[in-house]
Swiss-Prot record:
GO terms for biological process: translation. One of the early assembly proteins it binds 23S rRNA. One of the proteins that surrounds the polypeptide exit tunnel on the outside of the ribosome. Forms the main docking site for trigger factor binding to the ribosome. Part of the 50S ribosomal subunit. Contacts protein L29, and trigger factor when it is bound to the ribosome. This is Large ribosomal subunit protein uL23. The lineage of its organism: Bacteria, Thermotogati, Thermotogota, Thermotogae, Thermotogales. It comes from Thermotoga maritima (strain ATCC 43589 / DSM 3109 / JCM 10099 / NBRC 100826 / MSB8). The gene is rplW.
Length: 100
């Protein structure tokens, strides 16, 4: 499969704001929904350039669809890709700190 060239703004879709993600922030870990075509190198480059921080490592998870039902109608949630970005010591993403 040929990988398309993604711009840095297309790599990160949105930050994930959950109870678990807020606990991870204390360990310098930030969680993002990312483009399904993105890889670890693209995510690292995007976070470093967009937020002006240094990234230590990136973990990526493919989230599978979950079955859902509304009355007699059955369906699934969409599949998506999640990235957990660990920042180097002394760095935080100030734009995301005010959201909780």
């Amino acid at each position: 499969m040929k990988q398309e060239k993604l711009s840095l703004h297309d790599v990160l879709i949105r930050p994930i704001i959950t109870e678990k993600a807020l606990i991870l922030r204390e360990q310098r870990k930030y969680v993002f929904e990312v483009n399904p075509l993105a890889n670890k190198n693209l995510v690292k480059e995007a976070v470093e350039k967009l937020f002006n921080v240094k990234v230590e490592k990136v973990n990526i998870l493919n989230m599978k669809p979950k079955p859902k039902r509304r009355g007699i109608f059955e369906g699934k949630t969409r599949s998506w890709k999640k990235a957990v970005v660990t920042l180097k010591e002394g760095y935080t993403i100030k734009e995301l700190e005010g959201e909780h």
